[in-house]
């Protein structure tokens, strides 16, 4: 691998695309060589995202116009259902032997094609690649990510749920049949396309649950937790939309196994993430806040004793656009290419 890698971002006109550009622009080993947005092809990136107007960036283009012979790494930030054929063509094409890809859509997260079809409403069109794709929860799957050519970047809610839960399940500290995840996200999680439910007057000054019992991140969470314990795990998961731009707070209600409590759970999480750059377990009595991770790749986890004996409440916060999407994708890229994992991701949270 040369000193710098040429990167293409597919779907650069969305929020996750803009975050990829913002973060990669300061990555010392990356050259942004191609930015695609088919509906905005020919426009300057600054006309779409003026806050990044000071950067020297390529003009937005179509995917077909990219010189793939010059690209080393691809971030795919396109909607689910659109990436399977595109990624298949890239990896099976003349330059597929050298390309590495991080896909931010849901298309390669679920390992079972029938589960994907059930939740996303259509058959998977790249089943062989689906089998090959590595789930990119970096702190959990680092070794497999390092050798992958296709990584499926986890969803925002699944990241905030699995990071605290997987170490606890692996250690046998919680009952896998008694997990309730109450998650709240900022409006950017709905994407940048015009939708009535994302309008200011629809979101501001209120909060509501959505996808109750039917959200597509439920099976993604269950897949990861089931792998952690070696048997099927079902969770109760309900997301809520908050009147803020960024951030996710997952409040997770648990039943500790015999002999365990909030203290042993906190100790286990602290030990599991002691050497991790981006995951921090906060001290007893501290409740993490979304404003404390805004704009960063950090995750904060709090562990609290419930008033009901034997029950524990875990809270986890992240920026849904960074660790919940683009930041974790870059973290995966760093691992895939053998770069220091924190490269380009060491910025501190924005506050206030």
UniProtKB/Swiss-Prot annotation:
Similarity annotation: Belongs to the NAGSA dehydrogenase family. Type 1 subfamily.
GO molecular function: N-acetyl-gamma-glutamyl-phosphate reductase activity; NAD binding; NADP+ binding
Any Gene Ontology biological process: L-arginine biosynthetic process
UniProt-recorded name of the protein: N-acetyl-gamma-glutamyl-phosphate reductase
Pathways involved: Amino-acid biosynthesis; L-arginine biosynthesis; N(2)-acetyl-L-ornithine from L-glutamate: step 3/4
Enzyme's top EC category: oxidoreductase
KW Oxidoreductase (keyword) present: yes
HAMAP family per UniProt: ArgC_type1 (MF_00150)
Lineage: Bacteria, Pseudomonadati, Pseudomonadota, Alphaproteobacteria, Rhodospirillales
Purpose: Catalyzes the NADPH-dependent reduction of N-acetyl-5-glutamyl phosphate to yield N-acetyl-L-glutamate 5-semialdehyde.
Annotated compartments: Cytoplasm
